[in-house]
Amino acid sequence: YSQEEIYHHSAGLNPYRYPDINYYSSEYINKAYNRTDVTAEISGGGGRAHFYSNVSYYNQGDFLKVGEAANNNTSRFNVRGNVDVKLNNYIKAYINANTTFYDSKSGKGNYWEAAATMRPNFPQHAAPLIPTDMIDPNAMAAWELINASGNIITMGGRDYFLAGTQQNKTNVFADMYAAGRSKWTSRQFQFDAGVEFDLQRVLKGLTFKTVYAVDYATSYSTSYDNEYAIYTPTWSKYNGVEYITDLKQEGLDKKSGNQNINGSDADMTMLW
């Protein structure tokens, strides 16, 4: 880096041309996130039968507040129960069951990896998001590109476009705003039932027990996978003020609107 570049990055006079990104600032990360955890238990019974049921639900947000990542969410709903029945002095039976619904939603891009590995001035000479009002009003070719863009981000009353360089056509901020989102879904079910016979009339201490059990689990991922264009700015200074006088587009905006399903898996184990 030249002394001039070092000065401009440290001075912060134009953070959109000379970025100095703090990935851990409150601009991108919440100080806290919400988590809700609710559990209810029901039990009862009499001389011949006893039952127990547990119903639980939790919902958890995320620290991130950028793009689709602001909607990151994990939820889990679980129901578990069992019934024990004494049919008579010689026969007992039981049923246990459990089912779980698990969903995890997330925006594209690995923010924490970027925070740990990316330089604070990445991509060099262009912040990931640049306000459109930094473009010279007379730069008609640049405005034509911006007006045709499918990814103009509005924050705090200003419009931003996705920026980068020819060497860096993607970045984590653009991913979170424009690359789409994904959801991982898991469903689990366990069931077992058994009957126990007391055969002491045949032989003292002799019992017979039969069991049937099912363990079923399925999981899959759904996603909306988008492509996006970034714009490389050319800067000029007029009367001491820096403006963007030209933009070069890298890539294309593509949103099919189709939901993709992948990673589907299902397993079932039966026991008799």
Q: PLM features: residue spans?
A:
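A surface-exposed, glycine/aromatic-enriched loop/edge motif typical of exported proteins
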Residues: 1-3, 100-162, 217-248
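Outer-membrane beta-barrel transmembrane strands
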Residues: 30-50, 55-57, 96-98, 157-224, ...
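Extracellular/periplasm-exposed beta-strand and loop segments of Gram-negative cell-envelope proteins
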Residues: 8-18, 24-31, 66, 70-71, ...
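Residues embedded in well-ordered regular secondary structure
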Residues: 1-66
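Short secondary-structure subsegments characteristic of cysteine-rich extracellular domains
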Residues: 69-84, 211-216
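Transmembrane beta-barrel domains of bacterial outer-membrane proteins
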Residues: 80, 87, 92, 205-209
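C-terminal low-complexity, acidic/polar tails when present
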Residues: 90-106, 237-272
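N-terminal, post-signal-peptide soluble/periplasmic segments
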Residues: 1-17, 89-117, 183
